[in-house]
């Protein structure tokens, strides 16, 4: 099978395109497919905070596959064994949470590449990613088409940002606003002026280093700020939050209810 692996999301980052995404936390392939028909450039399937199993991730990749939206998987952690499974089910773009040091970044790079570039385990004959052994020269193509994003979301990571940006094999750095603001002493307050200043500075440093800069902003005004600061892959909502907002707003049309605010500004 002479198929060529391509990764439109990675190609867009290389060109500097602005790509707008949506966070998927509902854990269902049905909701993933609905989102894929909306036209977002990328869809983040969350395995860190949403209760997704590897098989759940697999089914959502299948649901998104017929559409133009590009899937990004965030596993619960950056362990070598888990990364191997997630890549084998067909993920081409990974977002690895809680990367605090350059050494962690190097370990993740190694886990995502086949030898001699890394230590990814070989099992193409049983992998959806290789069409069960039918893609010629799969290992080399996989190394080339893989897109690796890491999350910087702590004070320690901020201190090590420049070193992380120097790690070869990292395509982009994503600022995790919720954990970052908590680490800086402003829990649930990513809109604090000091946090905003740091986010803007980080985006500038990431782009200056030749990497893509990413962000999740559930507040449209914050999303626009990040785009203006230079972030080029930005998620502008979370499916479960949009669903609860819609439910609450519709109920409020007919009943006087007390519910959570529909204008939550942080993840």
Swiss-Prot record:
EC number: 4.1.2.53
Binding site residues for Mg(2+): 153, 179
Cofactor: binding comment: Binds 1 Mg(2+) ion per subunit.
Assigned keywords, A-Z: Lyase, Magnesium, Metal-binding
Reaction(s) the record says it catalyses: 2-dehydro-3-deoxy-L-rhamnonate = (S)-lactaldehyde + pyruvate
Keyword Lyase: yes
Top-rank taxon: Bacteria
A GO MF term: 2-keto-3-deoxy-L-rhamnonate aldolase activity
Residue ranges of the TM segments: none
Function: Catalyzes the reversible retro-aldol cleavage of 2-keto-3-deoxy-L-rhamnonate (KDR) to pyruvate and lactaldehyde.
The protein, known as: 2-keto-3-deoxy-L-rhamnonate aldolase
Gene name of the encoded protein: rhmA
